[in-house]
Amino acid sequence: LIGFIWDDSFRPGHRHAGIDIFSGTEAGVTPVIAAYPGYLTREADWKSTVIIRLPQDPLQLNRQIWIYYTHMADFQGNSFISPQFPAGTEEIYVEAGTLLGYQGNYSGDPANPVGVHLHISVVRDDGFGKVKNELEIENTYDPSPYFGLPLNAYENTDTIPVCN
């Protein structure tokens, strides 16, 4: 089930920088799989997030992009990321189809968990080999085309977005 999509405004002053994919299961059950081959990093303080660098954007080969996968921990921050990617992992090559972890409901605040889902973003490179800030919509691309999700949000503004 697709929840919020790229560029949704679900609270004042905020535009959603990715796609939320809900599974309808409990936290720690639904696998999260790498969509493309690339170089995985998990920062030392990331409990629920990995990012994969794609040296060649599959939709525009002359640029590098980063795919950001998050909410892979329970509401208290206990990670569901695969043990092969411990905190502090940098630039580990992964194939498409690699198990990254499992969907969770971690929000960063144990008193306010989110629903169990995967948030996935496609983030711009800064031109010097570093990822831009994923929280700023202008630093991201609409992820829909990268994952074969031709969502109908802009054509049907009065209905719930669904895949065509």
Q: In which residue ranges do the predicted regions lie?
A:
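Active-site loop architecture of trypsin-fold serine endopeptidases
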Residues: Q103-H117
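Small beta-barrel nucleic-acid-binding modules, principally OB-folds
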Residues: R11-T25, Q56-T70, S82-Q84, R124-E134, ...
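Acidic, glycine-rich catalytic/binding loops that coordinate metals and/or anionic ligands
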Residues: R63-I65, Q84-T98, P113-N164
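Surface-exposed, glycine-biased beta-strand/turn segments
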Residues: L1-T49, P55-D57, A96, N105, ...
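Short Gly/Pro-enriched loop/turn and capping motifs at secondary-structure junctions
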Residues: F75, Y106-G108, D125-F128
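Zn2+-dependent peptidoglycan hydrolase active-site motif and core
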Residues: A34-G88, P113-H119
